Amino acid sequence: MNSTKVPPEWKRRVKSEYIKIRQQKRYKRADEIKEAWIRNWDEHNHNVQDLYCESKVWQAKPYDPPHVDCVKRAEVTSYNGIPSGPQKVPICVINAVTPIPTMYTWAPTQQNFMVEDETVLHNIPYMGDEVLDKDGKFIEELIKNYDGKVHGDKDPSFMDDAIFVELVHALMRSYSKELEEAAPGTATAIKTETLAKSKQGEDDGVVDVDADGESPMKLEKTDSKGDLTEVEKKETEEPLETEDADVKPDVEEVKDKLPFPAPIIFQAISANFPDKGTAQELKEKYIELTEHQDPERPQECTPNIDGIKAESVSRERTMHSFHTLFCRRCFKYDCFLHRLQGHAGPNLQKRRYPELKPFAEPCSNSCYMLIDGMKEKLAADSKTPPIDSCNEASSEDSNDSNSQFSNKDFNHENSKDNGLTVNSAAVAEINSIMAGMMNITSTQCVWTGADQALYRVLHKVYLKNYCAIAHNMLTKTCRQVYEFAQKEDAEFSFEDLRQDFTPPRKKKKKQRLWSLHCRKIQLKKDSSSNHVYNYTPCDHPGHPCDMNCSCIQTQNFCEKFCNCSSDCQNRFPGCRCKAQCNTKQCPCYLAVRECDPDLCQACGADQFKLTKITCKNVCVQRGLHKHLLMAPSDIAGWGIFLKEGAQKNEFISEYCGEIISQDEADRRGKVYDKYMCSFLFNLNNDFVVDATRKGNKIRFANHSINPNCYAKVMMVTGDHRIGIFAKRAIQPGEELFFDYRYGPTEQLKFVGIEREMEIV
């Protein structure tokens, strides 16, 4: 789209419309300020008059202490040079109070937060007149670090979201008027064709190939309606005004009145404002700001499946938001730690534990198994080999949590044929619900869009287990589900569903030389001690992890979040320790990692109750920190003290804060150095933890060249985290120190007092 040359006429048109919009904004803003000033002045005068009318005189009634006769008094004999009667008052002595150390506002948090880079300087920090006198160029250098971008400075090419939308609409009106003058009725025909194309794409489920060359996606029918004649009549010359730059334009007005802008409009804006992005990026931004439907853009998100506008869509569209926003590393939606592009996709590999097999007996009187000829069909299907045989997979070389399910205390009373456990009370309740639906015949059954979408989601999980699908839906009997499935199977091939799963692995024995593996871990740790990169799950299904794998390129182990095979040679296997995992005999401890509860089960890291955990290498992920007390320090400012004692190498606390990039840390660090107070802590080669704005109490631990604590960056379930540990035995009430790793110059500049060593 950007390769097309923009005519000079369009560039002049964009510049002219932009100047008009800026002038209108300026005049409107001036009128708003004037009106606001008048309103505030009237309200102020009204409040002042009320105070004058209801003013009260305060009468001082001093309290005289019992020893008032012995207190020294102050005497006044004249006022402004005019003699007056003597006035005496006792002198009250206010003793000096030691002020508490200065503290800047910060938000307490017990976890790290990933934040975006600040490319615009929001405010110019005040350093005091002394700093500006000594280094007058500091502010200039600071602004240069942000490429001269300061919040509030509106350069000639300034354009916020509201101006951008108004500029697009103004160009659309001028473009439409130009077509009207060239050929009467052309603009109306183009507008009608565009809107009709959009409606047809929604009604017929057909969408053209988009601008990026993506394959077309079939869209389902929608209930959207529109009258093209009324749209043509409502065309106006008035610009769309918004009251605030942060407020989006009227979405419904944009949808109903205006067609989608022509590509030349975004190309012309991009040519005049290249710093705002390419034409395609501006197009995406316009869609986001106005929620305008691009007729050439396939739909991604659908209405809520529980809402009244639920549509009958494919499984991919139904699960789009879940797959996009759900973080499989935090098990949260829209987590604060991992960015969307870093979210691992769903792992489509076959599970190793048993699947829920179809029921052998009918689940109710309305079960699909009671259909004539169904038992013979099911018997024939049972002779076909299953998709996956769970018993064929070797578990000796597996470190997944599922490989040791046999050691758990499961209830096997209701399980049959290695199936999953089914609670009898739950089955009875479900059967009662299904029995109440027996009177609903298949002819009376209505499959809403929500029912159809939910079936497509469950069908990929339970396959042909229609009883299980019906038990989950609770609105249809399994016979109704079976009949609907036959219609769906005509359009959806079951073989395509089988291909989504990993084929079964053949039974094989694989002897792991544990000592060689531990030696490999140590070599990898030693070679990459100075090059620690952030972990991002690799995603190359069907291909082994080689030099093209992102994990191998960054010298990281493949984790359980990677979409590579579970037999990957680069995947960390966990440990098999029977002890506390606090020595180098443990592979996890040796690799500076915490034990993973999904991988390390022999050491007790997978136990939910803390009383059953024998592993000492899970403190960071479980939050087993010490009780810390904050108080003024004898060294500098505030300090942090330990309420209870700690043994050597015992976990104290995690250093939490904002996770920022190295570039952002350089920009912030220049300001912190001037304040002579920094909370930056290197996490890896990509990110830094900054506890200035957000953090926990360990941020107040002071520096010492002879500390009683040490910091260690550990890999905790795929994330680098900073743990503070006791370097020696620490007594209760002792202040905590760790080495900031200052250079000789910074040591003398920032740390003027060194605590005295106490011999215990």
From Swiss-Prot:
One of its GO terms (cellular component) is nucleus. Signal peptide: none annotated. It catalyses: L-lysyl(27)-[histone H3] + 3 S-adenosyl-L-methionine = N(6),N(6),N(6)-trimethyl-L-lysyl(27)-[histone H3] + 3 S-adenosyl-L-homocysteine + 3 H(+); L-lysyl-[protein] + 3 S-adenosyl-L-methionine = N(6),N(6),N(6)-trimethyl-L-lysyl-[protein] + 3 S-adenosyl-L-homocysteine + 3 H(+). The modification Phosphothreonine is found at T502. Component of the polycomb repressive complex 2 (PRC2, also known as the Esc/E(Z) complex), composed of Caf1-55, esc, E(z), Su(z)12, and possibly pho. PRC2 associates with the accessory components Jarid2 and jing to form the PRC2 Jarid2-jing variant (PRC2.2). PRC2 may also associate with Pcl and HDAC1/Rpd3 during early embryogenesis. This complex is distinct from the PRC1 complex, which contains many other PcG proteins like Pc, Ph, Psc, Su(z)2. The two complexes however cooperate and interact together during the first 3 hours of development to establish PcG silencing. Polycomb group (PcG) protein. Catalytic subunit of the Esc/E(z) complex, which methylates 'Lys-9' and 'Lys-27' of histone H3, leading to transcriptional repression of the affected target gene. As part of the PRC2 complex methylates the PRC2 accessory protein Jarid2 on 'Lys-46'. While PcG proteins are generally required to maintain the transcriptionally repressive state of homeotic genes throughout development, this protein is specifically required during the first 6 hours of embryogenesis to establish the repressed state. This is Histone-lysine N-methyltransferase E(z). The lineage of its organism: Eukaryota, Metazoa, Ecdysozoa, Arthropoda, Hexapoda.
